[in-house]
Every structure is written in structure tokens, then in C-alpha cells.
Amino acid sequence: MGAQLRIYRRRMRSVKATKKITRAMELISASRIVKAQQRVAASSPYSTELTRAVAAVASFSSDAHPLTTAVENPRRAAVLVISADRGMAGAYSNAAIKEGDLLIADLKARGIETSAFLVGRKAVNFYRFRNRDIAGSWTGFSDNPTFEHAREVAQALITAFLTEHGSVATTEKGDLAGVDELHIVYTEFKSMITQLPVAAQMLPLQLEKSDANDSATSGLKPQYEFEPSSEQVLNSLLPRYVEARVFNAMLQSAASEHAARRRAMKSATDNADELIKSLTRLANAARQAEITQEISEIVGGADALASASAGSE
């Protein structure tokens, strides 16, 4: 066997082995997407309705509550960026991190300092490599988050939000500086093909006209009675609201991660098929050239023997 043919066949074996890995990862991601979609569908209504409930309570409450009352001159904001723990998911993590950088740049342009809270090793490694400050980080569950994970993240964010600016709160994760706003950056799962990075403000809650004026269409404004008080109701809703928003964002990001990884692995598998076909053609051409050379050598040797025999006679 010629040296060139051996090289081609060695490369084919290597590509085939890689194809088996990418194909297996594609199938695993495809099987996990279904469950991830179901979890997103199950959590979204609760998160949406809780947000509407908070908006309704805040709209008809005369109390100034941190949940809905914006600081006149905000000086620091917390930004939660949700990425992946593992790679091989295309541009999924990079897109979320880039969206976070755009949000941070916009906040800094408004004169607002930022505290970065990160979920996923990709974001953590990105920040550490660039020597950026990290207020809090969580890893190891990006592709399968639970409500307990979301609650842990939400508690850190709430602690920072309820701490006055300039003060520091001591937690298990370390010292947290007080912030005036909470923002979250995650990847919204729209379909198997489309997943978009999204930046949204969680606190103070931005009341939309559709939320505040749901009753306007009927011409009647609802009357609310708060027991024991509107402030205590909002205090009770605050952690639930943040936990629900964070959990839903984590689930959306997990589903997006699986979809992105499946798409990336399918592309890698297809590329491996094309490369195998190309190497097969090159190997066949090399084999044909080798056979042609062997035939030429045999014919040449036969002619030489025939000429030698004729000369001896």
C-alpha cells in the first residue's frame, strides 16, 4: 500500500470516529429538547400571570415599593447572564455573553455601574480570562436547572437589590454591593430553529400599559383591598416574582442550549459525511494510480525480459 493511500485511510478512520461522537451528541440533545420544551411550557404561564398580578397590585397601590418604584438616579445595576456549562453548542453562549456586554455598555453610558452575576462556566471563564469582576457565579446545572438553583440565584439578586447603594451585604457567596436595578440576559426559546438572546429588566418592574390598564377596555377600574397591607403583599410577592422570572429564564436557556447543540452536532455530522466522501474519492484515485503504476511496472518488466531473451538468441 502506498504512503498516500495510508494517509487517506487513516484520516477516514479518524473522521468516522469523530462522526460517531457528533451523531451521538446530536441524538442526546434531540431527546432532551422535548423535556426541556415541556418544562418551559409548564413554567411560562405561572411566570406571566405572576408578573401581571404584581403589575396589577402595584398599579392600584399608593405605596412606594422597591418592586415598582424606580430610583431617581440609579448608580449601580446587577446583570445576570445565563450561559452554558459545556461547549459544542455553536454560538449559543457567545451570543448571550455579547448581549450582556451590550447591556453593560448601555448602562455604563448612562453612568450606571454594574455587578455581574453569571450562570454557566462559559460566562465565568469569559469574565475570568479578561480579569472582570464577578459578584456571583453558579455552574454545573445550565442544561437541567431546578427551582432550587433558581431560588439560590434569586436570593443573591434580591439581597443585592434590597441592600442600599453604598452598603455591602454579607452572604455565603461573599460580599454583595447594593444595586438599584436588576437585569437579566438569557436566550429565549422560540422554536427548534430560532433562539434569540434577550436582555430584560426585572426590577424595578416596568409596568406596561396593557398590564396597568387591563380594565380600561371595560370602562371600569377594579377596586383592590389589601390584607394586611399593600406593602406586605408586595413584600411577599417580591421573592416569588424574581424566583419565577429567573427559573423561567433558566429553562428557556436550557432548551435553547439543547437546540443549539443539536443543530451544531448535526452540522458537524453532515460535514463529516462530506469529508468522508471527499477522502474516499481521493483514496480511490490514489489506489487507481497505484494499480496503474504496478501494471506499468509489470508490463515494463515483461518487455525488458522479452528484449533480453531476444538479444540472447
Locations of regions flagged by a protein language model:
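C-terminal beta-strand-loop-alpha-helix "lid" module of Rossmann-like NAD(P)-dependent dehydrogenases
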Residues: M1-E313
